[in-house]
Amino acid sequence: MEMKNMGNMMKQMQKMQKQMMKAQEELKEKTVEATVGGGMVTVIASGDKRILEVNISEDVVDPDDVEMLQDLIIAATNEALKKVDELVEQDLGKFTKGLNMPGMF
């Protein structure tokens, strides 16, 4: 490979890296929402996998059935994190297509 081609390739990689870093920063500002149990529990998460809110309907708060509430919170949280993964793939997938880097995103 010629030095000129190698230099161009390095410039392209640096440009792509900057674009990817910008996209990662933008992900922090995006949110996803997951609702389970017919609206009983809603979890809102950021694009960098931080749980921002957990909203629980008063109807589901039953001191005699705490386990159901726990299950709904877990289900909503897992669904929100799944949606974040989909958002990350949508926003950053264009940078990793064709690269074989398992577990990177």
From Swiss-Prot:
Gene3D superfamilies, per database record: Nucleoid-associated protein YbaB-like domain
Cellular component terms (Gene Ontology): bacterial nucleoid; cytosol
Compartments, as annotated in UniProt: Cytoplasm, Nucleoid
Matches recorded under Pfam families: YbaB_DNA_bd
Gene Ontology MF term list: DNA binding
Coiled-coil ranges per UniProt: none
Keyword line: Cytoplasm, DNA-binding
Domain of life: Bacteria
InterPro entries reported in the protein's UniProt record: YbaB-like_sf, YbaB/EbfC
Primary residence: cytoplasm
Region described as Disordered: 1-26
Low complexity bias (residue ranges): 1-22
Residues annotated as signal peptide: none
PANTHER family the record matches: NUCLEOID-ASSOCIATED PROTEIN YBAB
Stated family: Belongs to the YbaB/EbfC family.
Classification via HAMAP family: DNA_YbaB_EbfC
Subunit (UniProt): Homodimer.
Function: Binds to DNA and alters its conformation. May be involved in regulation of gene expression, nucleoid organization and DNA protection.
Name of protein: Nucleoid-associated protein ABC0038
Organism: Shouchella clausii (strain KSM-K16)
